[in-house]
UniProtKB/Swiss-Prot annotation:
This protein's record includes keyword Iron: no
Protein name per Swiss-Prot or TrEMBL: Ubiquitin conjugation factor E4 ufd-2
Expression (tissue specificity): Expressed in the germline (at protein level).
Domain of life: Eukaryota
Gene that specifies this protein: ufd-2
Protein's pathway: Protein modification; protein ubiquitination
UniProt source species: Caenorhabditis elegans
Record's bilayer topology term: Peripheral membrane protein
Lineage: Eukaryota, Metazoa, Ecdysozoa, Nematoda, Chromadorea
Amino acid sequence: MIEDEKAGLQPMDISDASVFFFQADVESKDFLTSLFDCEGKSDDRMLRYADAIIDVQNLNFDVSPQCLQSNIAEIITKFVLLSQDGSRRGLSRSFNFIDPDIIAGCREEDAIEFLLINFVRCHHELGKSGTSNCYKKTLESTRKAVFSVFVMIQRGYLESQLRSQHASLVFTKRLLEDTVSNVFLRTLVEYLASTDECDEDAITETFNPIFGILRSGIICQRFEDNKDEIVRQILRVMNLLLSIRLPSNGPRPLSNLLVNREDFLPTPSEKIQGREFGLMSFLGPFFSYGLESSARRPNHRVFVDCEEDARKYDGSVNTEQKLYFQRMDPIRTMLHQLMLPLASDQGSRNKTLRWIATIISTNDIRTRSHYDPSDVLCDHYMTNFLSVMYMFSEKIDLSKIIVDYPFLPSSLINISKETRLKMDESGAVAFASQFADRPDEYHFSTVCFFLTIAAQRLVIPPLMNQISEYSRHLKELKHKINALKEKLNTVSGFERAEVEKKLNYETEHWKLMSRHLLCVKTQAQDPALMASSMDFVDKQMKFILNLLCDNLDLLGDDSQLPTEVSQMFCALPEYFLEDALDFYIFAISNGMKLLMERNADWISRLTVLFTQYHYIKSPFLVSKLVRVLSSIQPPLWFNVVRLRMAQENLLMCMIKFYSDFEDNGDFYEKFNVRGNIQYMLEKMEEDMFYKGKFMDMARECGAEFIRFVNMVINDATWCIDESLSGLKSIHDVEKKMANKVEWDNTDQEIRNQDLGVYEEAKRKVKGWLGTAKSNLKLLLSITVNSPEPFRTPVLGERLAAMLNHNLSQLIGSKASELKVKDPRSYGWEPREFVSLLISIYLKLNMPAFVKYIAYDERTYSPEFFHNAIECMRKNSIVGFSQLESFEHLAEDVKKEYEAKAELEEEYDDVPEEFKDPIMDAIMVDPVKLPSGHVMDRAVIERHLLSTPNNPFNRAPLSHNELSPDSELKAKIQEWICQKRNSKK
């Protein structure tokens, strides 16, 4: 007391302190007694309440907080151990994975209920102002005691009286019902994470069983059962638990706990498959909720009576699909919310990224053309997975992406075996070696960006391939069903029963596969997924273009673009670009409305890339780029033709690539590429700038343009020949079938062979006739606007020969062999073909081309043209004015033909040294080859257009290596003059 006076403190009367502590004890005892209020309790439960109240009255509060907590915990433990099975809670929600018969009204429910209620009371009292320190100590000790008992129950320390498994089920159910306060959870986690309060295993043994119950719960849900509300509650609770942080923005203990579970990252063996890992891992079942279907086990419970919708190709969706979109959108958002704390917390981030990377690496066979679906995760799982990755990538700033990450030895994406944009395998290895010593740690944005690109590869292209494959399969099934229906009308008895059985089987198969296709389309056409894809792919393309040119200004000119691309760009995997192109191809057909609502910079980027297609090694990748551009329709097409950076090069690149693909690509893909370029040229005809540029190129007759026109002639020739040969085969078989008696008596094996030829011929005609027509129309367009290239012998002679040959086929002596029963089903309109040929003839009615027609020794003769004119007149194949113009052309050609005959007679003794060694005709412009051989320029240039080598030794040869033989040319001209003078 004296010391207090020296310190200047007012001395306290001992009696006042006694009163203070007495009042605090009373307040504490009253509060603790209220926890065990027995009012309204049944007689059989009264005893334990009374015992607890007596224990409270005997408590000594003048002890340390730890001792007080222990004493209160002992009272609570004693009380809850006497819990009894009671009545079930009213209005309790039902969850199909928690058996109500096990936990409803059980002792554990009573105990948990008691603890939760009393925590709330403690928290409420602590929130009051003016609380004395002594009373506050009691409240805090009581709260910790509640946690202590709760944890003991959950850990199984009281297993003989209170079963931990039942307690976990009860608590999980309360979490799902949202009847556990967030404060309780947060404070409980803080208590468990405190080394002063609990051992390191406490949090694991308390919450791991709860995580296990939630995981089991999600496994029990089936999309077709429409239990979305349960799924949403499970995901909500998972997010709630994982998001709990320690004070002062500390770590998330439960996120760390989850990623350290053994089943979070099951150790993948060398043989582990994607499906096995995806479903074994803890998070797997959460991503597995959705519209499940496979070709082996089609989902027969969905899209019933909607099978015809599978045949639609316009991107439209039916009501049932829209319903599935609405159901999955909130669930995918909640999946992202579940993953967000795992990816955000420093302690759990690395393992979470490793889980994502392992899902990708173990399912990488989804990128193959053919794979066993049982080895990989299903489409709905991967679509959910990709949706989450897209959400992670929404806020990524490209300026913060470390571009060298994919090349690091420790990178989570493995690109070592990937084909590069413009680098061979050894170059890629050498390029990656420079990053061997880079640090392993990279920020989340970088890793997430590249993982999303890798994940996208496993989803978008496979879905597109499946839609294409199953659509084709359904089309074949429909043809088969129609054929069986026709056959059903012609058979009877046992054979009819067999046909009916087969028809029923094929019809049922068609229905199942239609439903499966609708399931696949539903995954791919989800508008939320497509919108996210558009945003990410736009970011992806911007990233690729940035490697070409930093801060590329799409409104500027092409001077920004480098002559040589960076090594980083060259080393990028092809799929970085290819997957973006695949998505745009799909989006143009199925999400045009979404594309129209977005910035059109993506079109500008693709156009720029095509005008510099030499940056890309693979012609197939460039062909896919062409396919995207050709698919763009007005008004978006305006962004292609009006891009300042591309205006100078776009047309030339189209023409050049048209020819370049000849030797680099697949035979059939060649026609696809050229068809796409032809379609782009058609659209450009409406643009005066490009129309004028095309005419200028034609007038210049540069090497690339000559090469381009030659390819058009080649393709037209081949496609027409294939189509006409197919029509002849159809005609021959139909002729046999028309004689029913003879056909019925024909050996079955021979009939089957003929029918095989018949079907193959029909496919061939349908496949090539449209391409033939397109090439003829392109030739006509060139002749209308720019006939100059056909003045040159190298092209004029080839086109004249092609026109003559095909005209003779169509209206010559064997034209009747092209008549078939149903020509329109193949797109076969012979009058239209003849009209196209005549139009090309007439547009090239100039002296040089007239000469080329007359000099065609293979087909032309005056009688041939005369007969053709009579046939067209008799059958009114072309209009009167066209026919009249063609008659005038025929007269001019006849005169040139007669003049040629005179020259041949005049030059019948041409010296051998003046003759072209291949054509055996007098040379007009002799040139020397590097091998020393001499040829006529027109002949060797025509040869080089299709085969760039020396015809005598097969050595590579180009136009630039041809040197004029002026001396020989002078001798030939002198000889010709002498012959003419001698004739006079």
